[in-house]
Amino acid sequence: QLLGQPNAVNAYIECCQRYVGKQKTALIWEGKNGESEQWSFEQLDVASAQLANYFKSIGIQVGDCIAGLLPRTPELLITILATWRIGAIYQPLFTAFESKAIEHRVLTANTKLIVTNAEQRPKLNHVEVKHILTVNAGTNLASNEADFWQEAKQQSDQCEAVLRSFDDDFLMMFTSGTTGLARSVPVPLKAVLAFKGYMQHAVDLREDDSFWNLADPGWAYGLYYGITGPLSLGHSIIMDERTFSVDHAVEVIKKYRVSNLTGSPTAFRMFFGFKEKFDPSIKTHLRAVSSAGEPLTPEVIHWFNNDLNVNIYDQYGQTEMGMVIANHHALDHEKKVGSAGFANPGHRFAVLDANYQEVKYGEIG
C-alpha cells in the first residue's frame, strides 16, 4: 500500500516522510576512504528540505528534470529525495559516463540542473545546462555553479511536499544505448507500488533484514531496488562508495551481517571466482540472494546453494518496466534452474504476434 492516493502522491513522502518520527536508520554509508556514517529518516528529512528549498530558489518547477552525477554518497540520496519533494523528476547519470553521453541525456531530457561533485565536475565543462550544484566546489566556480552544502545550509528545514498523480513522472531513465543512441524512459509515480511488490514478493525483504543491493544507482536496478523500493518499505539501505571488489564486498557483508543480498550475475561470478574469501561465518546470516541482468550460471547457483547454504534466484526485468518476472523468495512456487520464474503478483505475461494479438501455446510471436 502507498500512503498517497492516485491523484495525490509524492515519492518523497512514500520513501522518507512517512517514516519520520520512527527513529529508524535510512542510510548506512561506507565511504571510499574508510569512513562510515548512518543517516536516519529524520536527518534526511531536514537535509532534503534544505536542498529542496534551494532548488525552488533558483526557479526549479514541478515537472522539471534534475540530474545526479554523483557517486554513492549521502549527497546522492539527499538530491533524489529533494527532487521528489518539490514534484520534480530525478535523472540518474552513471559516474562512468563521459561528457558526450551526459550531454545527450541532459539535452534529451531538457535537464535544468545537474548535481555533481568536484571529481565529476570537469565532465560538464562543455555541457549546456542552466544550473550546476557541486559538492565541495571550491573557489573557482563557473557563473552558473554553486556549492552544495554552502547553499543548502542557508535554507529553511521546512518544505511541504508537492502532491502529484500516479501518472506523473518521478524518474527520467535512459536505455543503455547498446544498439544506438540511448532513449529516454520516463517512469510514473505508480511504479513505486510495483517496486514495493518486487521487494516484498521476489526479494522477500523483511523488517529484520540487513539489506544490500550491489547495483549502481546510476542504472535502473540500483535506483529502483537499491533506493526507491527498500526506502518505500521504511527499510535501511547500504551505499558503498568504493569501486567494487570481492575483498571489500566480503568486508561489508560481514560487517553489517547482510542477510538479504541483490546484484548482477557478473558480481556473483566474481564472488565464485574468489570463493575462498567467503568464510563459514557468512552462512550464519546470509538468508536470500537475488540476481538480475542475465541468467545465472549453474556453477554459481550450486556454490551459493551448497557452499553458502543460501538460495540464489534468477529474476528478470528491464529499465522500461522494472522487475516483472522472478523466482520469488517469498512465494511458494516451483523454482527451475535456468528459468526466470513467474510473473510478479499483479502482472500477466503473454507472447504477442506482429499485430499485438496473443499467440497460442507453441506458436512463435
Regions found by a protein language model. Name each.
Residues 27-81, 98-103, 148-150, 187-190:
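Conserved AMP-binding/adenylate-forming core of the ANL superfamily
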Residues 258-262, 272-334, 348, 356:
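Gly/Ser/Thr-rich phosphate-binding loop
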Residues 193-210, 217-260, 274-275:
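Conserved AMP-binding/adenylation subdomain of ANL enzymes
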Residues 57, 78-151:
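Structural core segment of the AMP-binding/adenylate-forming
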Residues 37-42, 170-194:
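Conserved AMP-binding A3 loop
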Residues 48-51, 166, 185-206, 268-272:
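Conserved structural elements of the adenylate-forming
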Residues 350-365:
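Conserved beta-loop-beta connector loops within the AMP-binding
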